[in-house]
């Protein structure tokens, strides 16, 4: 089946042809580990996890290499470490911040059903590669040293007259437009407003390494050089796919292209550039000042959003309901809809436990192969779910034949959910089962109190919330005539 992907550089959807089908290579920009990941950060993680799964499905698990970096050297990390651990030496405080944040990031994305990348390199483990690229750029006349800084010159790149890509081509901006949009105050060590930092001197106490290009003062890398170095180390000078959020197109990805292409004298850093759209919350831009800033952890473990916590499958399905290139409005209504859909799938798979290993249906793979159209793929899931729960063909048939057809559809639904990374937990582990049961009992207790106070509105709300989880309540009385509520999973 032909995979077609939208390329940000060429601005069209075209067939994806890997450089080497036996070694398909993808790089995605990962987190800067200074704070817990918010729901906007979750979108590229989920989107490119689905692409990783699809590539493995099409080319074989052993033939796909996915690299997602960890940025563990950055001004924001330094600031957070100094704030949170004022009594510690800065380097020790930085280690605490980065280790804690990276651990929380992994817990969060694991809960969202994401596979770990093939390689997850840290920036601080690739300083040697960064220095090597910088040395190449200085030697080639694309970078210069000024006041213990090393800076890249886009003007020098564009002077190559077609031998290299034009700086600004990924973002579709001219150099003049970028100069006009630059801030009035240009750092004194820059020759031009568009020049950007590859390396800078470290202040006393800050992380530092021996500097490149003959600079005596120890320093540290700029942000953009980190990804060029890590992608080069693990994927080579040119690779198949580079992904990230739309906010990274300029300047980060534009600068990556400049560094890598000029250092290695290539026309393309990546064959295909993919970017997911923005996320807003209830129709507004997410920001702490508006009070709608929410982390993945808060969604999973608190009642901050919508008055309840949400499971990872619900969050993932809600994210995938919108095509990755479109903006997404993160709303309570959308999560409730996703939760109901997960509950429907769960009930179906509970009915058909066990099952057989079957191929993912053509309709699901076809949808995903059309520029990762997860919205269309979910429509296919809904159709499979309906087939598993009713007769959709005409003509006389035996009950056994009908049940067999239902079971096949359920098996195909299970395989499709697995490809999309959506775990509906049809067979919960003991620990998860205990948490699930405890949560239900807690809600029943709250509902019982509401009924005792004749708060029928609250009682109905909790009943509906449990119904969305696939739980059916039965109200009755015990042997002493006291009200009692029992529950079971819907069938």
From Swiss-Prot:
One of its GO terms (cellular component) is cytosol. ATP binds at residue 288. A motif ('KMSKS' region) lies at residues 285-289. Zn(2+) binds at residues 29, 227, 252, 256. InterPro entries: Cys-tRNA-ligase, Cys-tRNA/MSH_ligase, CysS_C, Rossmann-like_a/b/a_fold, tRNA-synt_1_cat_dom, tRNAsynth_Ia_anticodon-bd. It is an enzyme of class 6 (ligase). The keyword ATP-binding applies. Keywords: Aminoacyl-tRNA synthetase, ATP-binding, Cytoplasm, Ligase, Metal-binding, Nucleotide-binding, Protein biosynthesis, Zinc. A motif ('HIGH' region) lies at residues 31-41. Its EC number is 6.1.1.16. One of its GO terms (molecular function) is ATP binding. Monomer. Belongs to the class-I aminoacyl-tRNA synthetase family. This is Cysteine--tRNA ligase.
